[in-house]
Amino acid sequence: MKTPLVGRAATAVALSLATAASLLAGAGTTTSASAAGTDFPQPTVHTQKAYDPEKSDFTARWTRADARQLKAMSDPGAPSRTNSMPSAYTMPEVPQDFPDMSNDKVWVWDSWPLTDEKANQYSVGGWEVIFSLVADRNLGFDDRHVYAKIGYFFRKAGVPAAERPRNGGWTYGGLVFDDGVSGQIFDDKSFSHQTQWSGSARIFKGGEIKLFFTDVAFYRNKDGSDRKPYDPRIAMSPGKIHTNKNGVFFTGFSKVHDMLQADGKWYQNGEQNPYFNFRDPFTFEDPAHPGKTYMVFEGNSAVTRGAKACTEADLGYRPGDPQAETVDEVHEKGAMYQMANIGLAVADNKELTKWHFLPPIHSSNCVTDQTERPQIYMKDGKYYLFTISHRSTFASGIDGPEGVYGFVGDGIRSDYQPMNQGSGLVLGNPTNLNFATGFPFDPDYNQHPGQFQAYSHYVMPGGLVQSFIDTIGTKDDFRRGGTLAPTVKLDIDGSSSSVDYSYGDGGLGGFADIPSDTEFKN
């Protein structure tokens, strides 16, 4: 392979070689386990207590004691190609004959709606609008990450999913940015690739749009090796939405504001780790702190890659737990290479062009290396922190499916409690933890055909969840995706949630169904 894989699922592979190796070593064999509860620790006690988001430096932890509940929930006797995880936390199986929402125009993956400060989803002039990462379909699907651009789609609002075309009825509107615009912010313009990664979009008075995204420059040699670390930055570009009888178009998006770069203090940077994660801005307002706009984003804890930085607090075992590990044991397993966190920032002006970092609100040190696309979701007075992670990015000794992980607390900065039996799992792909992972381009023979069926989930109002299709099928018969998956629905109640199998057809709603719930009015 001449060009190293970079990006979400691909970077996950590169960043977790030790984990992948341990899983591949067990390919074709089952993992012995005793009855659930006998070989696993108790989860860490979390209070859900809220702290001041700006005055406190409290950071919640998803501990190893918490994350080991994932394997405790898995059925050790589940046979080859079946799901070993509880159905209440498992996305229904997506059919392999899925339609393509772009009609073969572009690959589509991470997507997000047009929202306000409360995450309400807007239609404008009778049209629903979404933004997506897209790439030319002449590229191999796994080559898309370094060529990603932000595109947009639109469709008529107010049409029930059952009455739309099977592919969701979207029209591809094209790219948001003209060539060269998003590269303006980089002083060093000798980049080999300049790309755009995920973010969020907010609508304001007069139809002004502020598009928050991750602006990225790669500096590679012809053989694909890096001549210096890649440079991801959290950025924003303003534009304006227009509609007519034919659809949606935009003006603006000609200037990019360079807002945040990983600081090396709270958020790992390229000097500390050339493979660091820093991306996926999601902005919102908090009713408990009126007049403030906050942002959550994906980061890594600011330590030098490979430093033995796991702590007792990261492990989180209760005193005297017979299944507890020691810090030395965890370091010997190589878990210090997985150091994910979720960052927080606050806007310094009303234009939302200037921000400053606050301490992270959540860490997964020695548990996983990626907590992607974080978002704050509010319901019944509770604050839910949702994020996504790959099976391949979990640290040695931790295992769980690809999908959505959730945590609940009483404020933005809380002692977040992992949902669902203390595990954090909210919506996983059907997966068999008794067998190796494989890769989206080469599934393990024994894995469930849905192990890679969906990723990059976004939780919408009413508990609806959208995602994109990666790979569906078995090693001897699989199909790659590059389009949006069926929408599913979660029933969320306190620290628990479950998949609503009465929604749609056996729990699967329409493909690419991202409905608006609010009509924009100037």
Task: List the predicted regions and their residue ranges.
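C-terminal region of N-terminal signal peptides and the immediate post-cleavage residues
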Residues: S22-T38
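Low-complexity intrinsically disordered segments
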Residues: R8, S16, G26-G28
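Bacterial Sec-dependent N-terminal signal peptides
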Residues: M1-A14
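Classical Sec-dependent N-terminal signal peptides that target proteins to the secretory pathway
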Residues: V13-L23
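Carbohydrate-active catalytic/glycan-binding domains of CAZyme proteins
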Residues: G37-N522
